[in-house]
Every structure is written in C-alpha cells, then in structure tokens.
Amino acid sequence: MAKKQHIYLGLLVIFMMVLTMFAWQMTANAWPSNEELTFLKAFLYYQSYIMPFFLALVIWGFKHKQVSKSFMLIAVIGCSLGIYARFIEPNLLLVKETTIKTGYSLKIALISDMHYGLYSTPWQMQRLVNKLNTLEVDMVLVAGDWTYEPAKNSSLTEQLAPFKQLKHPIYSVPGNHDEEMPGPPLAKELKQALIDNHIHPIEAKTVDLGKVRLVGLADLLPLATKEIRLNALKQQDKPLLLLTHNPESLEYLPKLTQPFVMLAGHTHGGQVNLPILTEKILHLLTEQGYKRGMYALDNNNQLFITSGIGMVGLPLRFAMPPTIDILRFE
C-alpha cells in the first residue's frame, strides 16, 4: 500500500514539474508588463490542473483509511468548487437581454473585457464571434479591455482575425489593459489590428445613429488626454449613447444638456461573486462599488455595466459567467 502511495505522489510531483515548464513557456510567449508577475499567473493557471488528480488522490486515501472523513469532505467541496470556477464557468457563454426606456429604438450587443492573452484560447474567441453572428442586433459595442498580456509571437491582427467574420457593425473603445494601465505598450498595434479586422475604434469620436449619437469615451483614466476624449461630447443635438470602459468615467463628464445612457465594463461583476464579500471588495476598490447591471442616475440618465467575457488576476469565474448583454432601447 505504501509503495503504491509513493508511486502516486511521485507521479503527481512529475506532473507538477511538467506544468511548471508549461508556465515558463507561456511566460516566454507572452507580451508581459512584468515577467515575474506573468510567470506567477501562468504558474497558477497550469497548476490548477492538479485539482482533479489531488481530489482523486484524497478519495483514494479515504477509501484506504489514510485520510479522515472530515478532510475528505473539505477536499471534495473545495476541489469541486475550484474545478467549476476554473474549468467550467469560464467556458460558459450566456446571453442576457435588458430593456432600456429611452424613447428611441435600437438593439445592440454589448461585450467587454475579453482579455485575450494569458487565460484565453482561440476557441473561445471563435465561439464568441459565432454566437454574436446568431443574434439579431443592429450593432456590437465593445467596452474595452481586449487584451491581457497577449502572445508576442504573432501579430494582434492575426490573433483577432475571427472578428473579421462578424456580420454586424462593431464599434470599440480601449480599456485600461489596452493602454498600459497595467499592460504592455500595445495601444498603437491594437488600434491597427482592430481596423484591419473591420472593427471601428471610436475613442474620442462620435457616430450618428439617427435619433441618438454614439460617443466613444474609452477609459478616461489617462488624464493627459482627458480633454481630447471629452471633445466628442461637444455636439449635443440629440440623446447620447456613451461607450466607455470604466463606469467611474462618470466622474469626468461635463454637464450634459441631452439625456444619456452610459455603457461600461471593467468590473467583471466581481469575477468571483461571493455573497457579501464581493460587494465589500468592490466598494473598497471603487467609490461607488459598481458591479454589473442597470443603475439609475440623476436627471433620468442611466448606466449599464456588463460583466464581461474574460478573466484577470486569478483564472477563475464563479457565479458571474461570461455574458453577452443584449440591450433593447425603446
């Protein structure tokens, strides 16, 4: 019995070493802002594959009276939740519909925070494009954060190529990870990659949609360019649809004479959505504690935050699955 146990433990150690080599390879291929931190994230990403094997080892130990029942139960619950949050929920893709009262008719798909790079796969990108193509919408809006330390051995144009298949018009603003806050210096290359793949960057620009004007505000965090970005708000002849990344951009808005709906991402809905704890953390990180969904503002203005698609920090999503938000304005 002891000999078998030593063999299993030895195989587990070898498996961990192989996973560490994969983490080194991921780090070498990434376009990192901090190599040590990137390796740590890659290490966590790959070492998470141990969970199913660790769980099997604990159950085997319990059956052979090497592990107590209480330890086994804790391991089963912990590993089951971890396996779900690491391998199952991040690979879901929900579509949610929300109606917004505005007085004009428009139907859009809102996505954000895809974070293509460390924790994503080409399959997930292709699936997102395929799903968007099945939706009956007027356009797709992207509220920033396309990247998360993407691969440096191929161009961003090549990596984002599936979006060229999209049948809807698509407009985008960058997020903080697209503008070195944090992240590698890829803003210029990303903008060109979007254009090459028929995606319209509208940062500091407007798009006339008939009865409403779409305004691209991006993140507004780089204060040096704040005035340039806000110039797009000077034309106020009709209701405004403001596309930004961080909902805290509300704090930078000048007084607007037209009603507006602001669309944002950034929060991931907390990404790991734990009762009470996630709300407390969000309130510590931001003044308003924004999470996801609809928020009523002064003067009948409105804010909608999408929970996004990808992951940052930990390669986990829990009780906050990747979501495409369909917004029906009427």
Language model segments and positions:
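Soluble catalytic domains of enzymes that build or remodel membrane lipids, polysaccharides, and related
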Residues: 104-110, 115-330
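Non-catalytic terminal accessory segments
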Residues: 1-90
